[in-house]
From Swiss-Prot:
It comes from the Eukaryota. Its main location: nucleus. Common component of the spliceosome and rRNA processing machinery. In association with the spliceosomal U4/U6.U5 tri-snRNP particle, required for splicing of pre-mRNA. In association with box C/D snoRNPs, required for processing of pre-ribosomal RNA (rRNA) and site-specific 2'-O-methylation of substrate RNAs. Essential for the accumulation and stability of U4 snRNA, U6 snRNA, and box C/D snoRNAs. GO terms for biological process: box C/D sno(s)RNA 3'-end processing; filamentous growth of a unicellular organism; maturation of SSU-rRNA; maturation of SSU-rRNA from tricistronic rRNA transcript (SSU-rRNA, 5.8S rRNA, LSU-rRNA); mRNA splicing, via spliceosome; snoRNA guided rRNA 2'-O-methylation. PANTHER family: RIBOSOMAL PROTEIN L7AE FAMILY MEMBER (PTHR23105). It is found in: Nucleus, Nucleolus. This is 13 kDa ribonucleoprotein-associated protein. SUPFAM superfamilies: L30e-like. The keyword Ribonucleoprotein applies.
């Protein structure tokens, strides 16, 4: 695999990527996940996104780069993971997924895990 695109910042390390993909999988099971750049944009505009995950190997990466700007406007943490194929598997679909949004639900059983990941992503952004 080639070096990740320098525009893909912040990029999660392998341990954090694994934790993020686990939470993505659990949120998919609880119907708290939106898949794709367009749906991620919609969750940001509606104010229901907890955090945004994007794939660093997206080609061309510019099709995603409106999301970090929108995230900063809305004060939502965002992170890049190395592989769109792995993100697609975690989202429970057979195709690659370039962006996903974990949505908020106060009654969720994985609320604490979501907040834990959110804190780790926020420390990457500093």
């Amino acid at each position: 695999m080639s070096a990740p695109n320098p525009k893909a910042f912040p990029l999660a390390d392998s341990a954090l990527t694994q934790q993020i993909l686990d939470v993505v999988q659990q949120s998919q099971n609880l119907r708290q996940l939106k898949k794709g750049a367009n749906e991620a944009t919609k969750t940001l505009n509606r104010g229901i996104s907890e955090f945004i995950i994007m794939a660093a190997d997206t080609e061309p990466i510019e099709i995603l780069l409106h999301l970090p700007l929108l995230c900063e406007d809305k004060n939502v943490p965002y992170v890049f993971v190395p592989s769109k194929a792995a993100l697609g598997r975690a989202c429970g679909v057979s195709r690659p997924v370039i962006a996903a949004s974990v949505t908020s639900n106060d009654a969720s059983s994985i609320k604490n895990q979501i907040y834990g990941i959110k804190d780790k992503i926020e420390t990457l952004l500093i």
